[in-house]
């Protein structure tokens, strides 16, 4: 049972840490692994160009950290930095043009999905534009996070996550169309896509004039400011739609990458089952489970499972288990192993009490060398030289039925003591050898008299 628990815990740990993180499919917006890049597209006011303490690099690979020139720097180095900054901005304006357009239309969608964003370079921060207040104070930058993705209908468009790296309402998006000409509304800065390749920027392969703002709860939540920034506000009461279910094609794209992981998990489960289930259950399943159903059970769960197996195979129910109590011995066992209170001592006085009960009647008949039953005579350990117990041939009943009268030859056989260290007693009552102690002579005479009385023969030697 402990081995089975160990295998169970090992398998649970294997599946949890091997497959849990790969099998779980989250129904949330894809996480954008963005690489922040700041691109300057508008020059600072002339009054601030000479002593611009907030000078930033053109392409910062992490974020827009300011690199301030030291006050003690050489004037020539400052002029070169200013020239490079102006030259870089002029290069951006001549290549990409002004990033200003007007909003020509919007469309709200509750069943929007996109995919294949990872087939392009890492996501970048889009068109960060430094803005200034009327008193020549920097307002910050307008930044967008997103990428060129495949949207519904097989077209590629730019998708912006309005919530940054956080989760978003699945399926809700607002499409905003920008235009460069025939603008009745004021022009605003729109998110222009710049892809970063080895330090250089390339225009987006998606249409920059059609942008999807993904993750909104209602169309009124998005506000495009006059500077082209994106503002967020609360949705009106009752206008918040429920998030739609994930689209079928989007789920297929998410599950496509899990096929190999699921196959590995299935192989791990198969190996675990091969370790737990014996091969006999695979080769002969009917015989194996039938044998399991017929085997005795100890626990309640094991008994319930085997009862179900018996019902499946049409076997009779298992016998009822007796309540725990005192074990009752059978009559045969009680006769073979009597309790300690029924043991009887030898019928004559002895100087040593036996340490163990006498053997049964059948055992004494099987181990004796003569046909007459034997009796163990226990004497003092001071009498014998090597053996502490002397065995003499005599007749004892111990509850056996009395035997019929025997002939004189049988009496002569009873009077002969053949055990070692036991003197030979003649009919005259003399001890030839061995016994020097007086008690032993009296014991021998008593045994001979008892033997003669039992056989019914009268001693006529006197």
Curated annotation (Swiss-Prot):
Assigned keywords, A-Z: Host membrane, Membrane, Transmembrane, Transmembrane helix
Gene Ontology CC: host cell membrane; membrane
Membrane topology per record: Multi-pass membrane protein
Main location as per UniProt: host cell
Location within or outside the cell: Host membrane
The organism's place on the tree of life at top rank: Viruses
Disulfide bonds: none
Membrane-spanning ranges: 12-32, 257-277
Family to which the UniProt record says this protein belongs: Belongs to the HHV-5 US29 protein family.
Protein name in the entry: Uncharacterized protein HHRF4
């Amino acid at each position: 049972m402990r081995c089975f628990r160990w295998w169970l815990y090992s398998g649970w740990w294997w599946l949890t840490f091997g497959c849990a993180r790969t099998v779980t499919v989250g129904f949330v917006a894809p996480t954008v692994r963005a690489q922040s890049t700041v691109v300057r597209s508008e020059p600072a006011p002339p009054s601030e160009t000479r002593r611009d303490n907030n000078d930033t690099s053109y392409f910062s690979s992490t974020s827009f950290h300011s690199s301030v020139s030291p006050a003690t720097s050489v004037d020539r180095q400052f002029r070169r930095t200013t020239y490079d900054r102006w030259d870089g901005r002029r290069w951006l304006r001549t290549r990409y043009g002004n990033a200003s357009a007007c909003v020509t239309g919007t469309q709200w969608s509750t069943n929007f999905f996109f995919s294949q964003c990872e087939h392009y370079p890492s996501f970048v921060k889009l068109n960060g534009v430094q803005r200034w207040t009327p008193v020549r104070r920097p307002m910050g930058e307008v930044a967008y996070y997103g990428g060129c993705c495949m949207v519904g209908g097989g077209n590629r468009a730019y998708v912006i996550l309005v919530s940054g790296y956080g989760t978003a309402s699945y399926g809700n998006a607002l499409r905003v169309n920008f235009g460069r000409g025939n603008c009745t509304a004021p022009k605003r800065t729109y998110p222009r896509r710049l892809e970063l390749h080895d330090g250089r920027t390339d225009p987006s392969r998606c249409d920059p004039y059609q942008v999807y703002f993904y993750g909104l709860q209602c169309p009124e939540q998005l506000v495009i400011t006059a500077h082209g920034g994106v503002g967020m506000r609360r949705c009106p009461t009752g206008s918040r739609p429920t998030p739609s279910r994930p689209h079928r094609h989007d789920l297929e794209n998410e599950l496509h990458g899990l096929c190999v992981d699921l196959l590995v998990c299935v192989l791990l489960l198969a190996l675990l089952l091969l370790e737990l289930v014996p091969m006999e259950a695979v080769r002969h399943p009917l015989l194996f489970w039938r044998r399991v159903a017929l085997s005795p059970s100890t626990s309640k769960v094991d008994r319930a499972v085997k009862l179900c197996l018996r019902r499946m195979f049409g076997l009779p129910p298992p016998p009822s288990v007796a309540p725990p109590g005192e074990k009752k011995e059978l009559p045969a066992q009680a006769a073979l192993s009597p309790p300690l209170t029924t043991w009887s001592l030898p019928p004559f006085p002895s100087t040593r009490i036996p340490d163990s009960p006498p053997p049964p009647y059948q055992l004494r008949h099987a181990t004796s060398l003569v046909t007459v039953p034997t009796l163990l005579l226990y004497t003092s350990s001071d009498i014998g030289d090597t053996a502490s117990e002397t065995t003499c041939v005599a007749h004892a009943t111990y509850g056996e039925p009395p035997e019929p009268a025997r002939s004189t030859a049988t009496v002569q056989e009873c009077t002969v003591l053949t055990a070692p260290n036991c003197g030979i007693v003649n009919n005259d009552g003399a001890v030839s050898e061995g016994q020097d102690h007086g008690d032993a002579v009296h014991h021998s005479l008593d045994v001979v008299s008892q033997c003669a009385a039992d056989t019914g023969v009268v001693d006529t030697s006197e």
